[in-house]
Each structure stands twice: as C-alpha cells, then as structure tokens.
Amino acid sequence: PYANVLNEAYESSLYPKNFICSLPESNEYFGAKVIFGSKDDAKHTGLNIVREIPEAELKTLKLLHDGGAFTLPDEFKKSICWFLCAAAILRSREHKKPISMLIHTTALQSGHFEEYDVLKNWLIREANTGSILQLCRDVYESEKDEFTLKDLSEAYPDYGRLSQVNSEFPVFDKIETEIRILLSNIQNIMMGEDKSPVYREDGIHLCVDNCKANRLA
C-alpha cells in the first residue's frame, strides 16, 4: 500500500481498506486536519502556518525543474530562511537532535536535482555575501508574531504538549550566530572509512532522494 502521509483516518482515504487499519490519533499528532483545518469538524480551524505561492513563482519553479531557471522564487527563499531561523532557535536552546527540512516541489526526480544545484549555489553565494542574513532577519521579524502560543491553544486546545511549548522568541541578534554556523559548511553527507554517513553539527547537509538507485545522492 502507498504511504498514508498526512492522510486522514476515514475509511474512504485508506487503501486497501481491507488490508490496513488506522490507529487512534495521538493528541500530539499534527496531521492534515490540524494543519489545514476540517470543514466537517468545527473544532479544527487550521493553523496559520501555510503560506501561498504566487502564480508567477509557480511558473518560475516549473522552469527551474526543467533546467530553465537559475534562481529560486522569493517565497522559496523565505521558506529556507524561516527554517534556518527555526533551527537556530532550537540550537540556541541546546537542542541536540538533527533538524531537517523536506523540500518536495515536484514528482520528477530530475527536477529535484535541478533544484538542488540552484539551491546549493544560492546558499553558498548568499552566505559569502552575507545578504541571506538580512533576508533571514526580515523573514523572522515578519513571521514570529504570525503564529503564537495563543493561536496554537485556540486552534488545537487538546494538544498534549501545550504546556511544554516555549512561547518566547529571542531577538534575531541572539540567533544570528547559529545561522552563521549553519551557513559556514554547506555540503553533502560524507561517507566515513567504514562507509557509514558522517554528519557535522556546524553546517547544512544537502541531499536528494535518489529513489531509483535506492540511496541518497
């Protein structure tokens, strides 16, 4: 059966329905109903964490997948910066586990490789000039008050870890150093002498899901 990623527990949405069963949802689970809301459940109104992409940028993204564009759309850049800010906050709070961002903008593997090249070049170039830091600052200042603990408690009052959420956003200057560290090493995942992956804490690992070869590239 296909993966029921961000799927709902309705019989009609499960395939094959006579082969698998849906487990009860945990009160710590963020599924599509919580994120996007449900027209059938007034208790779930959705979370203000989804940003729409302008039609013009969708066209640029399509060109990028086809190898016809050499820059990232603005909203794409903003999403990368917001991830860097979020990762920097966690790192500043002594978070030790890996932090990842899944970028999935096309079903075509070739498009992901085109996107990878443009993204890597953009990160390296902007890190060298320092201009990405200003974009991170701008995105941080515009987004940090768009979704608050109050918003979360109203949209998902049954969330099991609501009392553990740290609602304080540090000033950008407090996380800038962590962002600089992340941008200081942009590379693939290297392999050690024993052929096992070697991960670094002071940088960003970029990889493409090379499912045809059953490996990461």
Residue map of PLM features:
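Conserved P-loop NTPase catalytic core
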Residues: 1-90, 134-146
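Conserved C-terminal RecA-like helicase domain
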Residues: 89, 93-216
